[in-house]
């Protein structure tokens, strides 16, 4: 065919499109047979290691990368009954959410993240982020352990202990 309306398409032109599967109930429509016979449909899965390599090359927030390493199933957790789902594309959008200060800033940050990945994933990420940002400076801790003030927050204590075990 190689026509788009009245325009003849070059033999060197390739058109690449993406879409969702009908069975995912994500707003996709069944492709007509005529169109299906003119396309190659290639299913693919996303892999955390691939996404992390891409994310590092594209300056995605390091805390977000660490969160997804901690909770790998959160990279892509599609549920057709939810309005918003965590997907690789949605996590990229989360990385663009600016940080805000103060209690209202945390609420605003959470709301914006929830708008991208849904409430459950946002709650998990925001809790991880808050804990991670409160971890001690480990180079300082190792250089002067006697001056280290033990955190009162048990989750920060636990994360600090786990980090020290890994060193």
Regions found by a protein language model. Name each.
Residues 1-167:
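C-terminal regulatory/interaction module of P-loop NTP-utilizing enzymes
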């Amino acid at each position: 065919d190689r026509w788009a309306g009245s325009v003849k398409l070059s033999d060197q032109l390739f058109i690449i499109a993406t879409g969702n599967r009908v069975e995912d109930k994500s707003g996709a429509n069944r492709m007509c047979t005529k169109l299906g016979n003119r396309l190659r449909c290639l299913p693919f899965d996303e892999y955390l290691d691939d996404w992390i390599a891409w994310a590092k090359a594209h300056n995605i927030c390091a805390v977000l990368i660490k969160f997804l390493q901690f909770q790998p199933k959160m990279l892509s957790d599609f549920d057709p009954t939810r309005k918003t789902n965590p997907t690789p594309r949605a996590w990229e959008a989360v990385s663009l959410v600016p940080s805000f200060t103060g209690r209202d800033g945390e609420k605003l940050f959470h709301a914006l993240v929830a708008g991208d990945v849904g409430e459950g994933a946002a709650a998990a990420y925001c809790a991880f982020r808050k804990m991670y940002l409160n971890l001690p400076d480990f180079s300082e801790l190792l250089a002067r352990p006697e001056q280290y003030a033990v955190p009162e927050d048990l989750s920060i204590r636990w994360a600090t202990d786990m980090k020290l075990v890994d060193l």
